[in-house]
Structure formats: C-alpha cells, structure tokens
Amino acid sequence: MTDKQRASFDNLILLCPNHHLETNDTQKFTVDSFRDMKQRHESLSISKRLTRNPSMLKNTINAISNLSLDDILESEELNVYNPKLKLNYNSVKTNYSLIQDYKVYQGKINSLYDELERQGSIKKEKLLSNVNQIYAKIKGSYVLDSENSLEIIRLNSDNILDDVFDELYRQLANSSFFEEDIILGVRLILVDAFIRCKILEEPIENDSK
C-alpha cells in the first residue's frame, strides 16, 4: 500500500504498520484519537513545507514594502503603457482611476520581479501564473457555462478585480506585514497583472463593444 493510499483512510489504523501491537489497544487508541493524530501530523507536515518553501507572494510584498515609489523618473512616466484600451474593453469603471494611477509603477515592479528572481526569492512567471489562476477561478464563478462570457465579464469587471484583490489579501491576512504595506503591495501586483493581461480579457482587434 502506498502512502497516498494510506492517506485516503479516515483513520490511522493502517498508517503505522510498525506500531500495530501498541495501537491494538482499542480503549486507548479510538478512531477519534487516530483522526486527531492524523490531523496533527498533516498540520505539522504542511507547516514544515511552508517553512522550506516560503510564499512568493509574501516575498514580493516584503520587497515592495522596502521599495521607494517617490522617485519615478519623468522618462518612466512618459514611456508607461496606457491601459485605457483594455480598461474600456472590459468596461472597468470604479477601478479605472486606481489602475491609471498605479500604472506608472509597472517599470519598478518589473525590475523588482527580475531582482527577486535573480535572488531566488520568486519565479516571476509562476507568481503571475498564480494570479492568473485566481482570476480564472473567480471569472468562472461569474461566467459559469454562459456562451456570452465576455458580456458577463464586462458587467462584473470591477467586482472581479475586487475579488482578486480580496483573495490576494486573504493569503496575506496572517502575515506580520503592516496593513498599509499589504494593501499597497497587492494593488501594485494587481495592476501589473492587469497590464500583463493576467487579469480580465485582452482586447481583440475589430471586436466592438
């Protein structure tokens, strides 16, 4: 029996073949006690895994919290991508100004991603892929099996953006970061992902609203 097969059982009776003589005492080792034992074991295993593999999202927020955003060069402001076409294509309204305001920082965020990747703190494409997967799941909860998915996305684009923000925020809820650093960091990641077309839909030429 493999470890995966053993893990599928509701208790630990078959999980400890080397300790069967001890655990044969049904008065001491009840089904509930085995379940508690299994739960503690799994929690410890997850905790160790997280310690070995810290969250790329947390590493990014930590780096952003130490980033100076006051020294944006005029050349950076002039060369920044204008997301107006995509904002209009997706009918973004309440988050329109936020994205326009934060777009100027994309160059700094991209450089930060590259630096963190060189340090081995994150893998940029994996981080962005995770954000895209969050978007895909949230989009699915709105679109369901509709054949007119784009129209539904347009009707709910601001709610979808807010839901992605909330999910990223939720993943950092138990961290030691300041509230302000989490909000700023998640907004920067969100806007960068929007510009990279990891969130909401990429405009298609000749597709009129």
Locate predicted features:
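Phenylalanine-focused residue identity feature
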Residues: 9, 29, 34, 50, ...
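Short, cysteine/histidine-rich loop/knuckle motifs that typically chelate Zn2+
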Residues: 18
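Long, low-complexity, intrinsically disordered terminal regions
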Residues: 60-209
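Histidine-centered nuclease catalytic patch
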Residues: 1-12, 22-42
